[in-house]
Amino acid sequence: MPSTIEAIYIILIAGELTIGIWGNGFIVLVNCIDWLKRRDVSLIDIILISLAISRICLLCVISLDGFFILLFPGTYDTNVLESIMDAVWTFANNSSLWFTSCLSIFYLLKIANISHPFFFWLKLKINKVILAILLGSFLISLIISFPINGMWYNLFKVSHEENITWAFKVSTIPGAFKQLTLNLGAMVPFILCLISFFLLLFSLVRHTKQIQLHATGFRDPSTEAHMRAVKAVIIFLLLLILYYPVFLVMTSSTLIPQGKLVLMIGDIVTVIFPSSHSFILIMGNSKLRAAFLKMLRFVKGFLRRRKPFVP
């Protein structure tokens, strides 16, 4: 019988998982329906579909890992199963971060105005550049997650010892080096997002100064687009700053002994990022926002028309 803390954990994780899968599933569903209707798909739709699918996978893996540790603590006594879970988690996490960096780069190339030949070339080739980054992101995540994970497992399967109990989770130094190597790979998309943010901010400041010189007295569409993009990237960075350190602690059992309570809190915090960011993406995209509001109106109308049940 789960304790009170464990019951609260299960309720919170189940709620976050439901919200996250619903939000990301909504993004995939709306874009796929629009794709089938128009027989065409835009670049931003491809990015959002890829990001939402990776987020769904990440949510499922995080939640599954938490339930295993809480309800079936002996599950990871088999190193093979732990290696598989590590690989899938690393792949889902890295691909999610890489696809988000693609979204930040797309905002940058689509909206920012920077007078540099290389930037102009990137803007002209935006479709090819973003598609190349998407494909490269997928391949990099795949290589980092599965072959490297398998290589480390085969290399240290004799010396790598692990003890998972209700009290703590500890591993040896070879496993620590492996996990740090895999986790540091996720820093690259984070750095790309930071670069995109600062370039967008630079472009916004520069554009605002030009508007002030002309003394128009109101914001033009370009300024509004800059502001929306900067706000979207800022929110993403804040969520990522909350998520990434906790993720590092959660996956660094090789260096930091972790109590059951720490693992549960870590799971709850890490699920916030992929769950909440989906709704920020929905409200920041005109097509998704319109579909979401239409759905809300339908639900509201359905509830109004529904007659109360009288026994």
UniProtKB/Swiss-Prot annotation:
Glycans are attached at N163. Residues 33-52, 110-128, 203-233, 284-311 are cytoplasmic. InterPro entries: GPCR_Rhodpsn_7TM, TAS2R. Several bitter taste receptors are expressed in a single taste receptor cell. Gustducin-coupled receptor implicated in the perception of bitter compounds in the oral cavity and the gastrointestinal tract. Signals through PLCB2 and the calcium-regulated cation channel TRPM5. One of its GO terms (cellular component) is plasma membrane. The lineage of its organism: Eukaryota, Metazoa, Chordata, Craniata, Vertebrata. Pfam families: TAS2R. Belongs to the G-protein coupled receptor T2R family. It comes from the Eukaryota. GO terms for molecular function: bitter taste receptor activity; G protein-coupled receptor activity. This is Taste receptor type 2 member 9. It is found in: Membrane. Keywords: G-protein coupled receptor, Glycoprotein, Membrane, Receptor, Sensory transduction, Taste, Transducer, Transmembrane, Transmembrane helix. It is a multi-pass membrane protein. The chain crosses the membrane at residues 10-32, 53-72, 87-109, 129-146, 180-202, 234-256, 261-283.
